[in-house]
Amino acid sequence: MRTRHTTYQGAAMKLGVFLVLFGDMPFEKALDTAKSFGLDAVEIGVGNYPGSSHCDTGALLKSPAKLKAFSDAVRSRGLEISALSCHGNPLHPDPKLAAAHRKTQRNAILLAEKLGLDTIVTFSGCPGDGPKASGPNWVTCPWP
């Protein structure tokens, strides 16, 4: 399928997919699938609620060779990474969960820097409704 571009107010818009949708596929097969649909970009889940089935941030941050192979897998298909995704709750009233989500967000920021990306998709977080809260206080609806 040929890559197509949509325009909005005269500017070209690239089309992409949240690669987590193909989380049951190996990374390279998921990239091939995205490319076969004529897409230009992928948003990659790097932990927290989206999971990290295609991206081990710890390994990529520690190994320049693994980071290069990861980046090359995307670029060799004519795709680009539009964003890293790490939706979580760094303000969760459970201190262990909040700390884990903050660590994932921090690693996403460090990985984005190494990949030359300027976009990370995340949640700001939602605290509990008081000092003894055990869960976040979602005012309008629960998620996830």
List PLM regions with ranges.
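A short, Lys/Arg-enriched amphipathic alpha-helix followed by its capping loop at the start of a domain
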Residues: 15, 33-39
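Transmembrane beta-strand segments of Gram-negative outer membrane beta-barrel proteins
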Residues: 13-15, 79
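Conserved beta-strand positions in the central sheet of alpha/beta enzyme cores
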Residues: 43, 83-85, 121
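Active-site beta-loop-alpha junctions enriched in small/polar residues
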Residues: 18-22, 45-49, 86-89, 125-127
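Glycine-rich, proline-tolerant flexible connector loops at the mouths of alpha/beta enzymes
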Residues: 45-71, 125-131
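Active-site acidic/histidine proton-transfer and metal-coordination neighborhood
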Residues: 28-29, 33, 68-69, 73-80, ...
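Short, Lys/Arg-enriched N-terminal segments with co-localized hydrophobic residues
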Residues: 4-12
